[in-house]
Amino acid sequence: NASGSAVRKTIGTDERSPVHLALPQNQPTFPLLALIVSGGHSQLVLFQNHGDYQLIGQTQDDAVGEAFDKVAKIIGLPYPGGPAIAKAAELGDPRAFHLPIAKLAGEYDFSFSGLKTAVLRTVQREVGKDFTFPSHELPALVNDELRHNMAVSFQYTAVKTLVDKTKKAYDNFQPASVVIAGGVAANQELRRQLREALPIDIEYAPIQLCTDNAAMIAALGYFRAQID
């Protein structure tokens, strides 16, 4: 059927396909720019219509959610890293560390592996030990002040990486709407920076769909069925 084939098109085996996208429950306005951010995906997708989309940017290494998980492990925070880092960041000094944003050839592409390495090197320097990652010894040496300061610095930089590329895509393509989907869409720092960067109201996939891929796929199939 039409909805089934549409879902297959969207969630196909091609790893570049926007698996984590759930279009908003109300009628979306096209053209639509989607930022898909999760443990498995960091993608910018431009939709001209349902099923008519173009991948314009993606991570060249770690997905942003994966970077959150790895950094959480480095500084001794639990899994999943996203919520743990967001909570620790509330207690940190955002000026404590200046972390790098990767410069890439792809205009809308992301990279987080250099940021993760910068966190590791900074923590090694701060504790005076060069334990490698992953290591149980390193997080044990991280005190609360370092943990909180690194959490807020990493979160700010990772989010700014996403927001800068999303703003560049928005400015160039002038979409009618912007949608954020995936587990990292729940991050409040991401929402704050996007509000400041974009002159448009941003729509978010429902939180329950942000973290449950099966529910997202079902929602997408249902939505397609309504319009076919």
Residues covered by each model-derived region:
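Acidic, glycine-enriched active-site microenvironments
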Residues: N1-G12, P18-D228
